[in-house]
Amino acid sequence: MMMARKQDVRIPTYNISVVGLSGTEKEKGQCGIGKSCLCNRFVRPSADEFHLDHTSVLSTSDFGGRVVNNDHFLYWGEVSRSLEDCVECKMHIVEQTEFIDDQTFQPHRSTALQPYIKRAAATKLASAEKLMYFCTDQLGLEQDFEQKQMPDGKLLVDGFLLGIDVSRGMNRNFDDQLKFVSNLYNQLAKTKKPIVVVLTKCDEGVERYIRDAHTFALSKKNLQVVETSARSNVNVDLAFSTLVQLIDKSRGKTKIIPYFEALKQQSQQIATAKDKYEWLVSRIVKNHNENWLSVSRKMQASPEYQDYVYLEGTQKAKKLFLQHIHRLKHEHIERRRKLYLAALPLAFEALIPNLDEIDHLSCIKAKKLLETKPEFLKWFVVLEETPWDATSHIDNMENERIPFDLMDTVPAEQLYEAHLEKLRNERKRVEMRRAFKENLETSPFITPGKPWEEARSFIMNEDFYQWLEESVYMDIYGKHQKQIIDKAKEEFQELLLEYSELFYELELDAKPSKEKMGVIQDVLGEEQRFKALQKLQAERDALILKHIHFVYHPTKETCPSCPACVDAKIEHLISSRFIRPSDRNQKNSLSDPNIDRINLVILGKDGLARELANEIRALCTNDDKYVIDGKMYELSLRPIEGNVRLPVNSFQTPTFQPHGCLCLYNSKESLSYVVESIEKSRESTLGRRDNHLVHLPLTLILVNKRGDTSGETLHSLIQQGQQIASKLQCVFLDPASAGIGYGRNINEKQISQVLKGLLDSKRNLNLVSSTASIKDLADVDLRIVMCLMCGDPFSADDILFPVLQSQTCKSSHCGSNNSVLLELPIGLHKKRIELSVLSYHSSFSIRKSRLVHGYIVFYSAKRKASLAMLRAFLCEVQDIIPIQLVALTDGAVDVLDNDLSREQLTEGEEIAQEIDGRFTSIPCSQPQHKLEIFHPFFKDVVEKKNIIEATHMYDNAAEACSTTEEVFNSPRAGSPLCNSNLQDSEEDIEPSYSLFREDTSLPSLSKDHSKLSMELEGNDGLSFIMSNFESKLNNKVPPPVKPKPPVHFEITKGDLSYLDQGHRDGQRKSVSSSPWLPQDGFDPSDYAEPMDAVVKPRNEEENIYSVPHDSTQGKIITIRNINKAQSNGSGNGSDSEMDTSSLERGRKVSIVSKPVLYRTRCTRLGRFASYRTSFSVGSDDELGPIRKKEEDQASQGYKGDNAVIPYETDEDPRRRNILRSLRRNTKKPKPKPRPSITKATWESNYFGVPLTTVVTPEKPIPIFIERCIEYIEATGLSTEGIYRVSGNKSEMESLQRQFDQDHNLDLAEKDFTVNTVAGAMKSFFSELPDPLVPYNMQIDLVEAHKINDREQKLHALKEVLKKFPKENHEVFKYVISHLNKVSHNNKVNLMTSENLSICFWPTLMRPDFSTMDALTATRTYQTIIELFIQQCPFFFYNRPITEPPGARPSSPSAVASTVPFLTSTPVTSQPSPPQSPPPTPQSPMQPLLPSQLQAEHTL
């Protein structure tokens, strides 16, 4: 090295010797360790100059040549490199090896006879005229390579590179190699020269070998290891530069890079160079006919070409060029192929357009046919060489004709087949349209309501699918869906009718509870007709609700068979049978005068009623006509200001039956008068059969002449009025606002609102004729009802023909259109029979309200629903009333062939046998039956006439004496059908007498009233009236009875003590104190006398009532209740809890059991009877919590009709479990308008008051709502199920109470849960007197929602939104903006806009479920609220309409455009009220992207 520095001071020169395992195949294996490749890559790194094969087996001549020069080392030449410190140096590279004789396979003899280990460690090398080594091919051809001699023929070695092969070498043991290397290292170490271990062939390295090599190096002092790969050119330069740093201590230490990291860098460098080279080739080479020589010359000077050739070599560069040429040629051929294939259909259309010519030809035969066509050469060219894409034809751009050999390819065959299909499609389009329709009709997968997207998958593989366009599919499918949906709905309606017993047993009302709806779905769930509407659940639920509405409120209009309802047919038949020209005018004058007439009671003291009546009359025309919706109505007003117990102030008179009542007040005293008058009016009719005053529509109005809407007094009156309206279940109207006019009590808009409500109630009434009193029996002897099923496959004309054509048939005196009079000989005398022909649904209500001596019930033998309705009807009929069953068949042949007809005939006969009724069948083919077939039945009726009449009279008396809340709540007792539209009977218009005896030992009503008067003078008078009113509704109140001859009862002290005890127990017992005075022409001996006036404990055998057995002889039959349990659930008026003593104790009596219902006598009736007592009758809002009973209490039974029916032993366990889980107290709770947490504990001045009282123009948002939403957005946006999961009721009540006391309540400090706050917020809206979305706006919203076009629909909804009252609009905007924000976090809280709308629409809209429109529009309401939440920016912030659900903005700008609507506020001169909940730092605004998550509907 010192000599090198003397020669060149500037550029240092280092001599490096590369050593490692060498020798024969025995020592080193079949290949070397890679010393030559390492030297080759370092000295000549270009890929073209790198050689993998360097042999050590040489001939004697090669060994003696100038390159080897009889030495066992190779001189690789001189290399100049710039090291890391940018200092250039020169290196002479020498490889120490051992050459093998190719003859003896022993090492060649050399001048140095030392072993390899010692020879490799030599530091002085000398060989005169030794040439630089390139590769094996150089040996023997030295003149063909550059000849460069080793400098001065000698070198002094400055350092050693010790190579270790870490690959899996063939026939080489790595451990032996390590031993060799260890010995070699020890020898090299003696020279004191730097040594670096080089691991070669790391690209094929074995992990263990590499680890062992590092272990070996660590065992030596300061021995560095470099992992290399000469083939991949990884770390080769690093190995030599590391050794140079060790040689020259003054140079910086080289960082040794691990192999895989260096390999990654090298691979990235090669990949970058390749990409640049490919780009260069694609830019230069555009034609697939280019060659490598010309292109390589063009790229010679390009750095991209040079870099890639340097790294990968010329051969790889050429390979990439050829790949590019091949790709260009392929693309060119494909372009030509596409042109030819595109022209091929045109050639087919021109040459073979006739389907008949080619219909059955294959492509091969069609090819021959093409050659015969005259214009063949115009479209095709026949090439001498094939295939066409391998010939020069591909470059013949001028000839666009199709190569004929293209017809042999698969795409050409497919085009030919497509041409055939096209021709066939044109021929068979009409046929396939019909085939598609038939396929839809026969496919079992096409079910009602299945969307087209789902149905398409079932017909995709059908042959005819390709023959129809999408629009044709959808048109056919839409029509087919309409047909099958209509059919499925009809079948489902028939299913509901087949389960008539279930619906009547459940005693459903206008708002069925969730439990009852669950039972209905559970019972019907397994029916195929129920499952058929699985995809139309909304429509199915609407049908169920519609059917429930029909069951609860049966009219001709709600009848499922409308307009073919039996009632309409019967009315038409009877009216056309008896109408006469001379009677037309009379008939018109006798028609119902109330059709276009409104009778309105106005109740208000101190002149309020009279003043309002005058104001309303001032708005009417001269003849008291009022215009509503363009139609003229006669308005009859009855102002009442005094004591309603007096006849002059009675709500109803013989000529006036009210349709509604306006209740006016302007002070606490006038409000107390209203409550007391309503109480008295209802109380006076509790015992009547036409107690419709109990359900009279009421409207409570606060009169405020001055229009002053401020002040504590007014707010207090409003709040009290709302509470009273809630208790009375009536409408409360806000006081008339200022600007109406001086002196006005109510504006015209409010009057129209009230009258419209009355019209709606009036239209829903289908009043059955009032019950005939006993005195009317002088007109007719028997009253028979004939029941027909609507929709049965027979004609009512044929059934009634024998009746109407009978000579004895006459028009009914009562003028009814559904009854006739018959005079028939029964026994020895003629009897006058009133025959009423009604549908079953009209007959249900008269089973209890009308005196009926017998029923003739028809049913169709081939219709299940017909017999099911008959069973449901008979369940509630008393077993003393004779029944005639009539089965209608299609003839004897049909009965034999039809299993259903045979089964239903058999069941009808069995029912008749079990109830001791009569049965007959009439073929519909021979409907001209004779009335004589009913004569045995008429005889049965005559025999039981007396006991039926006595039973009817007793039931009315017993019902009056045991009236409970059921009178008010039962859908049967309270149904409009049970009321009368005719004038009251004389007994009904008599003034009410004292209900209790004026006896000091008995509770006195007069005392109650005196107490009431004293309490009214105090501040709590109103609350006392309401509590008194509720208590009277919840206790038994006897009816007023008429005077009767004095009858003295012996009431012992024990009796009175029992009564006192009962009074202390809270049971109100009543004793009639007024004598029963007979009227003119009244014979007391003809009628049963109620005998339940004396209060006594009953024995097992008790006197119930007495029946006149023979009026001429004065004998009386006393009927006793032998088995009390038989009266359970009868609904026929519960037994009085008072024992009675007979008026005829000394007379002979006969014992008869008290009548029961047919359901108790017939096993085929009442199969769903166990459901009757499983629920508390009422709507969801009325049910309240389940009341649990003790087992022993349940075993003792329950007195009266509401006793629990025990489970049957053979009952279905699943059904029994349902009943047990849903079992409720059988006593019906008093109806409540809505559960309110404020009613139970305190009277709030904030909750449950009108919205206008809790907002101001400065603060348009209620402070409570603002606090709740701020709290929820700060802590609860990520709460799963927010608004769906209910909060704790007691905590919600506590929150509202605390806020009521302190409006500055901090929710965070109180540590309320998020669900509690959310529930309290919903409760605030639920308790508003009117919903946040006004009812009149709901109608407009529904109409706007019906618009099909989405954009037009949204604009229409926005216009309706502008009509909201200002207060409602601001709060609605605030709440919807908050819900929109909640929906943005649906991935966390799982509350999408759909889920939120399901939870909120009942709270915000509160629809009136007493109307069918509201019942069937629930899905519409929910969708409207969902749209408001989804499109909140559009509705409230003038933003564009957002994408529909499932869409996403296509760019960041699109997203941004949907985000900031909540944060942008318009610049105004005044502070604007809060428009939406402010964004919190924890929850930044997110894009308004709709979500498709689903959640269950849980309110």
From Swiss-Prot:
Residues 1058-1089, 1124-1146, 1177-1207, 1446-1499 are annotated as: Disordered. One of its GO terms (molecular function) is DNA binding. Changing residue 1226 to A: No effect on total phosphorylation levels. Abolishes inhibition of phospholipid binding by PRKCA phosphorylation. Decreases phosphorylation by PRKCA. Abolishes phosphorylation by PRKCA. Residues 783-947 form the pG2 pseudoGTPase domain. Changing residue 1236 to A: No effect on total phosphorylation levels. No effect on inhibition of phospholipid binding by PRKCA phosphorylation. Abolishes phosphorylation by PRKCA. Residues 592-767 form the pG1 pseudoGTPase domain. Detected in neutrophils (at protein level). InterPro entries: FF_domain (IPR002713), FF_domain_sf (IPR036517), P-loop_NTPase (IPR027417), pG1 (IPR039007), Rho-GAP_domain (IPR051978), Rho_GTPase_activation_prot (IPR008936), RhoGAP-FF1 (IPR032835), RhoGAP_dom (IPR000198). It is found in: Cytoplasm, Cytoskeleton, Cilium basal body; Cytoplasm; Nucleus; Cell membrane. Phosphorylation of Tyr-1105 by PTK6 promotes the association with RASA1, inactivating RHOA while activating RAS. Phosphorylation at Tyr-308 by PDGFRA inhibits binding to GTF2I. Phosphorylated by PRKCA at Ser-1221 and Thr-1226, induces relocalization from the cytoplasm to regions of plasma membrane ruffling and prevents the binding and substrate specificity regulation by phospholipids. In brain, phosphorylated by FYN and SRC. During focal adhesion formation, phosphorylated by MAPK1 and MAPK3 at the C-terminal region, probably at Ser-1451, Ser-1476, Thr-1480 and Ser-1483. Residues 1448-1470, 1485-1499 have a biased composition (Low complexity). SMART domains: FF, RhoGAP. N-terminal part (1-266) has GTPase activity. Required for proper cellular localization. Interacts with RASA1. Interacts with the general transcription factor GTF2I, the interaction sequesters GTF2I in the cytoplasm. This is Rho GTPase-activating protein 35. It comes from Homo sapiens (Human). The lineage of its organism: Eukaryota, Metazoa, Chordata, Craniata, Vertebrata.
